[in-house]
Amino acid sequence: MVSLEQRILGPLLPPLVDRDVVDLGCGTGRFTNALAAHFDAEVIGIDPSKKMLEQARGKQIGQRVRYDIGSAEAIPLPDDSVDLIFMSMIFHHLAEPALAARECRPVLREGGTAFLRAGTRERISAYPYVDFFPASRPILERVLAKRDDVCQVFEAAGFRVVAVDLVTQQIAPSLERYADKLLAGADSVLASLSAGDFEAGMKALRAQAAQVDSQSVCEPIDDFVFR
């Protein structure tokens, strides 16, 4: 497990040796195997995309990880079946965040934890691509919730807020590598820009990368712990 996963999973999450974990909105399984290793736990990765689940299964390590199709708004698990629901960067994709929070509550056993990593509106100015792609700012302001609003959604579903912490994570070792990553098209906000806006942003980013010494690129993420 790489250091990023260790930093994310360690400080805010309780020990869960030999327990049950859900990686909700697991995508291609970036964290699923890491969760199983970190907690020595049974982990179920759930995602609505068959294509992403196929990629996740290709990365599967060992017998303690399995995958199932489903959504946060309709979690395909019985009540009182897991100890931790882990959600990474899915909140802004949820069609019905309040319903998703309500779905989490009964699935958790007594004392269970919902852990959410999310981009929030307060952090937009610190996102490394915003200055290069100014058309992304109004989109981010529309799709990202405020920190307090995220907390209120889960509180309304019966959770209490245990912790909210800002984590700054390295996402690329240099601006040049960051530009390559953005060009791959994984960011849904940039994918929604016009071709002209995207090309102009990439040109500006490449120009900046050529002028500066190699330096890592970081972005802020808010971590929420609910019980």
Which residues make up each language-model segment?
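Class I SAM-dependent methyltransferase SAM/SAH-binding core
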Residues: 22, 28-74
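A conserved beta-strand element that flanks and buttresses the S-adenosyl-L-methionine
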Residues: 86
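Short catalytic micro-motifs in class I SAM-dependent methyltransferases
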Residues: 89-93
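Conserved Class I S-adenosyl-L-methionine
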Residues: 28, 162-227
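Conserved alpha-helix/loop element of class I SAM-dependent methyltransferases that forms part
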Residues: 2-19, 34
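Short alpha-helix
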Residues: 142-157
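Conserved class I S-adenosyl-L-methionine
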Residues: 113-142
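A short glycine-rich, Lys/Arg-flanked "PGG" loop and its adjoining helix->strand segment in the class I
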Residues: 98-110
